[in-house]
Each structure stands twice: as structure tokens, then as C-alpha cells.
Design a protein with these regions (language model features):
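Structural microenvironment flanking redox-active thiols in thiol-disulfide oxidoreductases
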Residues: 71-113, 121-127
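Structural micro-motif
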Residues: 113-115, 132-135, 139-146
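N-terminal targeting signals for export/organelle localization
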Residues: 1-42, 183
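Short active-site neighborhood of thiol/selenol oxidoreductases, capturing the structured segment around
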Residues: 52-73
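Short loop/turn microsegments at loop-to-beta-strand junctions
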Residues: 36-37, 58, 142-144
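Thiol-/selenol-based redox modules, centered on thioredoxin-like
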Residues: 140-183
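A short beta-strand-turn-helix
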Residues: 30, 39-59
Length: 183
């Protein structure tokens, strides 16, 4: 009986993982060269932040599943580690997940994060960017990243993100994009 439950659990988990991977393959995320969907969400300070607030700057818009989880913490730490390099390139980092402002504030305080985390509690922005993992009653933001140019156009999309090397990958892409744009 216990073996049957374990086998069923493994099969369900396998189906979930394959289903998420399948979503990525058929992604309807904003494509490179298209305008980034506009949004307004509250930050960890409970203040509204809109994409258009950053017109004229490069934006690294990264979606992540959940505050205080291992992969999300590693990813956030690495963005924080590299924050000065992003700022030198005229870029801002905006993190988005489904947790509320209070959770984001606690996460930023505990982990020493000095960039904005946005509360997408209704998954509206995650949906706009095709970055939602749906688990029936629960939804989380999928680990996707969009690099948006100063004119609000998507220039790079990362759909299969690994937390550890991700900030370095984004920095390399940003450097390449800026060189191509003559910056």
C-alpha cells in the first residue's frame, strides 16, 4: 500500500514537471521585439510601481515562485551581488511573485535586497507575461526573466532559468544588447 502511494506520488510529480516544461515549449510570453506589457503593482514598500516609470532605462523583469525558498533566495542574492553592475549599465531589477507586500518586505529585510519586489497577488502580471504555474487552487509565478530596453521593447527572454548562474547570464545578455544598440 505504501509503495503504491509512493508510485502514484512519483507519477503525479513527473506529470507536473513535464507539464510545466511543456508550458515553456508552447509559451505565449511576450516575444523579443514586441512592446513589453504595461503593468502597475505594489512594491515591498506598498507603493505602486509601473513599468512606464522606468522609460529610458533598461529593465530586468524577473518572475520567481516564492519568497524564502532556496532557489529564489539564491537568485535574489545573485541579483543583489551584481546590482552595482546593473546600475552602471543603466538597468533596474524588478522581481515579481505572487506573495504580498509584507512577505516581500520581510524577504528584502532578511536577505539584504536593495531592489524592488512587486506583489502580483492576483497573478495578473504573471499571466500577461505567461509566467504562471497553476497548481489548481494555488498559483505561483514561473521562473522567467525579460530584459526590456529603454523604449519598453522586450529584447531578451529567459524561460528555462537556473537560479545560480542566472544573474551572470542576464548581465552578459545586457552587455551584448547594449553593444548591439551602440551603448
Amino acid at each position: 500500500m505504501k509503495i503504491t502511494r509512493i508510485a502514484v506520488g512519483v507519477l503525479l510529480l513527473t506529470g507536473l514537471v513535464l507539464g510545466i516544461r511543456g508550458m515553456r515549449a508552447d509559451s505565449k510570453a511576450p516575444a523579443v521585439g514586441t512592446p513589453a506589457p504595461e503593468f502597475t503593482l505594489n512594491s515591498q514598500e506598498a507603493k505602486p510601481v509601473s513599468l512606464h516609470d522606468y522609460k529610458g532605462k533598461w529593465v530586468v523583469l524577473y518572475f520567481y515562485p516564492k519568497d524564502f525558498t532556496s532557489g529564489c533566495t539564491v537568485e535574489a542574492h545573485n541579483f543583489q551581488r551584481d546590482l552595482a553592475q546593473y546600475e552602471q549599465k543603466g538597468a533596474v531589477i524588478l522581481g515579481v511573485s505572487v506573495q504580498d507586500e509584507d512577505s516581500h518586505q520581510k524577504f528584502c529585510t532578511k536577505e539584504g535586497l536593495n531592489f524592488k519586489l512587486l506583489a502580483d497577488t492576483k497573478t495578473e502580471v504573471s499571466t500577461l507575461y505567461d509566467s504562471v504555474m497553476n497548481f489548481g487552487v494555488a498559483k505561483l509565478s514561473a521562473r522567467h526573466t525579460f530584459v526590456i530596453d529603454p523604449n519598453g521593447v522586450v529584447r531578451k527572454v529567459f524561460l528555462d532559468v537556473k537560479p545560480q548562474p542566472h544573474s551572470e547570464e542576464v548581465l552578459a545578455a545586457l552587455t551584448e544588447l547594449q553593444a548591439a544598440a551602440g551603448k
